[in-house]
Swiss-Prot record:
Catalyzed reactions: ribostamycin + UDP-N-acetyl-alpha-D-glucosamine = 2'''-acetyl-6'''-hydroxyneomycin C + UDP + H(+)
EC category: transferase
Protein name (Swiss-Prot/TrEMBL): UDP-GlcNAc:ribostamycin N-acetylglucosaminyltransferase
E.C. designation(s): 2.4.1.285
SUPFAM superfamilies linked to this entry: UDP-Glycosyltransferase/glycogen phosphorylase
């Protein structure tokens, strides 16, 4: 007789699934998290966004299949308005993973500081406070929250855990070559800034290997910019699309640096984490959410970052590889999945718990 699973989880995935060229951070996370959960005896299944649009049907499936926890995408209709009051049984089993900050910041910049919870975090059972900028995201609802890092804005949510993602889906290698090209990701800064960045780097004779944040309009515009900068003796290689599961060496092999200018509040960034795992140093903006934890070189603006690189600042060592991997992440998620929905919320998990490794924006992740 087959042994019963340790828990049952249901994850929302974009309609494109796992075979789309637009594969990004969310797909990377769900692919490796679900595999590690299954290996540890927790059942993990998926439903597509179009299927989740019918909240009543989703609630019926959760009840019928005895799902312990359902993980919608952060932009799900489950989190719109007062929907959580209409389907309390579903929301009691809902876990919101903050893979981006779109619920709190329309332009994906850092959410504003909270004057209410700056000193004292929100407490379980307390009514949502007047003046709390997270009010519209319903921190008072029965949903559990998983954050990928510890920031001031996470203190507004009483039922929270901090569980960063991992990067050991690529091997621990030392691929850096100080004389190699700079890998440049575009699509997360304004097009005019991307053009200036390209012009300065190619004008200085820097060899580039360019990848794009393909989910964004800026990323698509950057492709056209790069084509205009190819040729005429400029050393610009373009990788329009890649699958990091198999193409990690094609992307980062022999690179001297990974240059990732992003104005977004990155809750996690797989491209940066993967570069560190592969031994390539990262350069990023200093106010990029989780990005600075992976960066060996930071600056406040794209221009200042290019200044530092051209002044020789690119000769830096990569940050240490995170110790924890997907098995560790899955173990933490399994605890969340097994938590009884009706149980009272415990204290917030400390920022360091489960760490050691250390969107749709990468989501806003890679």
């Amino acid at each position: 007789m087959a042994e019963a699973p340790a828990g049952r989880a249901l994850f929302e995935i974009y309609d494109e699934g796992f075979d789309s060229p637009s594969w990004g951070g969310v797909e990377t996370a769900l692919w490796h998290l679900s595999r590690s959960l299954r290996e540890a005896g927790t059942e993990a299944e998926f439903y597509r966004s179009s299927e989740g649009a019918d909240l009543d049907a989703l609630a019926a499936r959760v009840e019928r299949d005895r799902v312990d926890a359902v993980f919608p995408l952060v932009e799900s209709d489950l989190f719109e308005g007062a929907a959580w009051r209409r389907l309390p049984a579903l929301h009691a089993r809902t876990v919101r993973v903050w893979h981006d900050v779109s619920r709190l910041s329309a332009d994906l910049s850092a959410p504003p500081p909270c004057p209410v919870h700056a000193r004292v975090p929100a407490l379980p059972g307390a009514p949502v406070a007047e003046g709390c900028p997270a009010r519209g995201a319903h921190p008072e609802g029965p949903m559990r929250e998983v954050f990928l890092g510890e920031w001031p804005w996470t203190r507004c949510f009483p039922r929270r855990s901090v569980i960063p993602w991992a990067a050991d889906h690529v091997p621990a290698k030392d691929l850096c070559d100080p004389s190699g090209p700079v890998v440049l990701q575009l699509g997360k800064i304004d097009t005019v800034d991307a053009e200036r960045c390209l012009r300065r780097l190619t004008g200085a004779g820097v060899a580039l290997r360019v990848v794009f944040a393909t989910w964004s309009r800026r990323g698509r515009e950057a492709r056209e910019l790069v084509r205009a900068h190819q040729g005429a003796g400029r050393r610009v290689e373009v990788l329009d699309a890649y699958d990091i599961r198999t193409d990690w060496e094609r992307v980062f092999g022999g690179a001297s640096l990974f240059l990732l200018p992003s104005v977004f509040h990155e809750t996690y960034n797989f491209a940066a984490a993967e570069a560190v795992q592969l031994g390539v140093p990262v350069a990023a903006l200093g106010e990029g959410g989780n990005l600075p934890r992976f960066a060996s070189l930071t600056a406040p603006t794209p221009d200042a970052l290019v200044d530092r690189l051209l002044a020789g600042g690119g000769a830096v060592a990569p940050r240490p590889r995170p110790a924890a991997g997907w098995r560790d992440v899955a173990a933490r998620y399994a605890e969340v999945i097994r938590e009884h929905p009706a149980a009272g919320a415990g204290p917030a998990v400390p920022a360091g718990a489960g760490e050691g490794r250390g969107g749709r924006e990468e989501e806003h992740g890679g």
